[in-house]
């Protein structure tokens, strides 16, 4: 039973990307920081914004890389190594093309699934970390993927994603307690309204 002690949100830095689908992982960590009054401060050493605080009685670090998505490993890898956090204690929240908006899934291990942020992390720390996959939907054509992930979702899809993130946040205690199987059951059972 490995307790989550590092929660990472993947996305792209800058105001122009803040509301894009690719930043769903950022949204999760930002809302988590707000919920538990954890201040995220610029951390140039690790190319990101990081914070540390108590979440449901556990000491947890939060990280939002300020590298572009395809360079996420430049932040996550040195951060986890410096603080000696094993992959089993890491949760990475990210957008997921292969799931509809409003669908959210917790998964342990696996490959990068074509996700450029994960693709940059897996070779360095392995694949045995936890992923919170936040559905953003697929545009239907491979040629339209870049514009889709870097585009802002229409309000109805945005609401579905926010509701799914809120549901995952309500299961934070299970994650930091190391009750991953129970967290998976709760989070993965979520049905969009």
Swiss-Prot record:
What Gene Ontology terms describe where this protein resides (cellular component)? cytoplasm
Binding of tRNA, residues: 17, 68, 70, 116
What are the entry keywords? Cytoplasm, Hydrolase, RNA-binding, tRNA-binding
Q: What is its EC number?
A: 3.1.1.29
Stabilizes the basic form of H active site to accept a proton (site feature) positions: 95
Report the enzyme's class at the first EC level.
hydrolase
Where does the UniProt annotation locate this protein?
Cytoplasm
What this protein is reported to do is described as: Hydrolyzes ribosome-free peptidyl-tRNAs (with 1 or more amino acids incorporated), which drop off the ribosome during protein synthesis, or as a result of ribosome stalling. Catalyzes the release of premature peptidyl moieties from peptidyl-tRNA molecules trapped in stalled 50S ribosomal subunits, and thus maintains levels of free tRNAs and 50S ribosomes.
Location (main, coarse): cytoplasm
Q: What gene is this protein a product of? A: pth
**InterPro entries named in the record:** Pept_tRNA_hydro, Pept_tRNA_hydro_CS, Pept_tRNA_hydro_sf
One GO molecular-function entry: peptidyl-tRNA hydrolase activity
Q: Name one GO biological process term.
A: rescue of stalled ribosome
> What reactions does this protein catalyze?
an N-acyl-L-alpha-aminoacyl-tRNA + H2O = an N-acyl-L-amino acid + a tRNA + H(+)
**Extent of the signal sequence:** none
Q: List the disulfide bonds.
A: none
What NCBIfam families has UniProt attached to this entry? pth
Protein name as it appears in the record: Peptidyl-tRNA hydrolase
Q: Pfam families under this entry? A: Pept_tRNA_hydro (PF01195)
User: How is the quaternary structure described?
Assistant: Monomer.
Q: Where is this site: Discriminates between blocked and unblocked aminoacyl-tRNA?
A: 12
Show the active-site residues.
22 (proton acceptor)
Q: Which family does it belong to?
A: Belongs to the PTH family.
């Amino acid at each position: 039973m490995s307790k989550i002690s590092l929660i990472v949100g993947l996305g792209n830095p800058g105001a122009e990307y803040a509301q894009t689908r690719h930043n769903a992982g950022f949204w999760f960590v930002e809302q988590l920081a707000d919920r538990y009054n954890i201040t995220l401060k610029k951390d140039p050493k690790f190319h990101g914004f990081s914070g540390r605080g108590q979440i449901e009685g556990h000491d947890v670090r939060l990280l939002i890389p300020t590298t572009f998505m395809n360079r996420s490993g430049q932040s996550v890898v040195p951060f986890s190594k410096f603080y000696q956090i094993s992959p089993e204690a890491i949760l990475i929240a990210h957008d997921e093309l292969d799931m509809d908006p409003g669908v959210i899934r917790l998964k342990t291990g696996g490959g990068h699934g074509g996700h450029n942020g994960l693709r940059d992390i897996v070779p360095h720390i392995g694949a045995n970390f936890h992923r919170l996959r936040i559905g953003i939907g697929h545009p239907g054509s491979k040629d339209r993927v870049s514009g889709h992930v870097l585009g802002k979702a229409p309000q109805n899809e945005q609401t579905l994603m926010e509701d799914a993130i809120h549901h995952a946040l309500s299961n934070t205690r299970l994650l930091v307690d190391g009750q991953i199987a129970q967290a998976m059951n709760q989070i993965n059972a979520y049905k969009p309204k």
